A protein has these predicted regions:
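Amphipathic alpha-helical assembly/interaction segments
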Residues: 1-128
Length: 128
């Protein structure tokens, strides 16, 4: 809802970066279920944790939004988890997907990383 140019968010669910991170985490989870069994508990487990960490750190940081520096710290953790997820996806793509079929989701994570970076800058410069 917009009132006089300000955006009011009732919950972290209203944040575009959270919504995108949540959607991508679900896709990564489903993707890992198609990996060979020996990868389910190693590479698969690691990427499931890193992809879910993105959304979870956004949510936890939003819960501390009253404390700007805490909020920023959790958003930075989220961005770092996004980078980790991209690294994991690249490894899985190179090992298990010779057709480079994960390039699309890798690009979506790059977009999420850019959006997180812009949101971090917004919070740093505009959050009261």
């Amino acid at each position: 809802m917009r009132v006089t140019g300000l955006v009011f968010m009732k919950s972290y669910n209203d944040l575009e970066v959270y919504q995108l991170a949540y959607e991508l985490a679900i896709r990564v989870h489903k993707l890992t279920m198609t990996l060979p069994k020996y990868e389910m508990f190693e590479q698969g487990s690691q990427i499931r944790r890193s992809s879910k960490s993105i959304k979870d750190n956004i949510a936890e940081g939003y819960g501390r939004k009253k404390y700007k520096n805490d909020f920023i710290r959790f958003l930075i953790y989220s961005h770092a988890s996004c980078d980790e997820t991209i690294s994991q996806l690249n490894m899985i793509n190179d090992i298990h997907f010779e057709d480079n079929s994960l390039k699309g989701i890798i690009e979506e994570y790059n977009v999420l990383g850019a959006k997180l970076n812009r949101f971090i800058n917004y919070v740093e410069n505009n959050w009261k």
